[in-house]
Swiss-Prot record:
It is found in: Plastid, Chloroplast. Belongs to the intron maturase 2 family. MatK subfamily. Keywords: Chloroplast, mRNA processing, Plastid, RNA-binding, tRNA processing. Usually encoded in the trnK tRNA gene intron. Probably assists in splicing its own and other chloroplast group II introns. It comes from Cycas taitungensis (Prince sago). It comes from the Eukaryota. InterPro entries: Domain_X, Maturase_MatK, Maturase_MatK_N. One of its GO terms (biological process) is RNA splicing. This is Maturase K. Its main location: plastid. GO terms for cellular component: chloroplast. The keyword Flavoprotein does not apply. One of its GO terms (molecular function) is RNA binding.
Amino acid sequence: MDKFRRNGKEDTFRQRRFLYPLLFQENLYAIAYDHYLSRSSSFESMENSSYNDRFSFLTVKRLISRIRQQNGSIVSFGNYNQNKNKLVGHNRNFYSELVLEGLTVVLEVTFSIQSKHYLEGMNEWNSFRSIHSIFPFMEDKFPHSNFLLDIRIPHSTHPEILVRTFRYWIQDAPSLHSLRSVLHEHRNLILSENLDQLILIASKEKTRLSLSVLWNYYVYECESLLVPLWKRFSYSRSLSYGAFLERTTFYRKIEHIVIFSHKSIKDLKKRIWFLKDPSIHYVKDRERFLIALRGTYLLVKKWRYHLTNFWQCHFHLRSQPYRMSIDELSKNCFSFLGYLFSVQMKTFVVKIKMLDDSFITDPITKEFDPIAPTTLLIGYLAKERFCDISGRPTGRLAWTGLTDDNILHRFDRIWRNILHYYSGSSKKDGLYRMKYILRLPCAKTLACKHKSAIRVVRERFGSELFTKSSPKERELISLSFSKTRSQRERIWHSDILQRNPFVNSWWNKQNLQVETPFDR
């Protein structure tokens, strides 16, 4: 892989236009074959894959040669002469998967080359890989916005739309013909209802890696067209007229600019103030876009109309209205990556002292407030059978066959994962409850194993029961739950590279809700 990347870096122009010869590199299909076997071991036993021993690179090359000879027409991998190619039964899908994997490796190389210049200049790129790295950005930018546009990217796309997307990047016609053939072979996977269903079906078909690459290309195409437009909009800021309202001549000019102007300077000042410095801030998770805007409600509706036309005209997709919602940040909360966020209006007392007098004022500020969703966390623990739906702890009878250290380690690991991920929550009372819910099932499981009472288990193992926590982690817990203001600051970690299992469960639940059309 490093060799192909170096070759592409030396001559990116040639790499983009002549990718087809890479498909004949046996190293690529060796990688694809390893990917296929690794996923086969996860979904089915090796005894069921009797055709693995008959794998042939020459057969794969013949398949690709036939695709090239068809002059771009769609080829079915099962329409070969059985006497010539010996490609029968389940071997058809097997070699189809290998061709798809080979294309995936080639596309991954080109995608990494094209997107590498976006990472140049980031000296601390490792810290930006953390999921928590997005929260400080939201904490800094979102309180200054007043509207939030929540968008679900349309993803039920036609294979030809993906081919057209790749044509902007890859100008090698034979590679595009091969890609078109493979995409039509897996058309049912691409035309799934939602992304989670696509990943589920793709896992069964052992093409999850390949489809994730296609999805990344599709999302990158959306971002490459929308983000520059948002940047130009943010840079073209309106002029603030607040400092010039006392001038009569300037007021007359503004009166002609604003359509619904008022004779009262007070009313006019309020209207002009909302036109000051519009801005757009954007974050993404999977197929979900969050766009925070500062401007009028009419401006937000125009952006929603523009995005609807964008997907309809550029990708020939119809975006349903229920997949785009508009929320006012000061009145509504929103969820993202397992957190519940809201923008709260906070007041604090300031004493201003002048030369001859002093007075007290209470300015109002906006504060970004992340909260751990306690109720949904309890629902997830109930689903995993740590408690019932009301939060009453229950024991894990399936773990009674494990050793005491293994049981303690499992409960302790679950608690530390929850605490680590939700360390940025502004309210720690819900995490206290999570610890209580997990501590009692741990004691009940040990009591059931030793056939004793919970009181005996507590006397033996101590009241804490989570004995695997290191001193550094216990210090972090004490700081997180401290009552002083200086020690209750939110903590965002730079080592969280994967989503919490609860976040994935919550995401699936939200997708089921959002797929039911309703009027926003």
